[in-house]
Amino acid sequence: MSVVVALAVTPPRETGPGLRKLTYYIACSIDGFIGDPQGDATSMYSFVNEEYQAWMNGEYPETVPAHMRAAVGVDADNKHFDTVIQGLGSYRIGLDVGVTSPYAHLREYVATRSLAESPDPNVELIADDLVGRVRELKAEEGGLGIWLCGGSTVAGELIEEIDELVIKTYPQVYGSGMPMFGADFEPRDFELGEVRTFDNGVLVRKYTRQR
């Protein structure tokens, strides 16, 4: 059984007409790591039980990779996002097993200077000025939000552009590993919104950036 706590949240400051939100939707350990030193987070998979999987599939169906949707019974329209941004490390998880467009139901962007050309027509590479390109995407009229999938380096580069955090905290301590943000020290304030807990020990928190 999951428990939801909804806290009163001050509406975020408007930053422009039609501005789309950039949401960092990410899983991490209790001590804030999104993976081991190489970015591997498979140890967290053991906590994905039926109740928690059903919530993720129902609330964030667009975050289920395209090649897995039929297997897990996801056939829903995009609910929060129509665009995904990820670094090469995150993208390579699928690429290494032959999946060139892991989120074919979204507009896909990969931030990398290592790939000379895109492996898939649906995937646009961003080699330079990642912040500028994301600002262009946020300024587009209409549409849904933008999902920042990871990893640490890309999140660090885009930290000032992030409007919302959705953090899935798994009941594990890593001790060391890949941090949520690869960025220099600077305090940045977020306001806590909804909190959801699950019987498997997973805690999901939603935060809004205070500017």
Regions found by a protein language model. Name each.
Residues 2-211:
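Enzymes that bind and transform nitrogen-containing heteroaromatic metabolites
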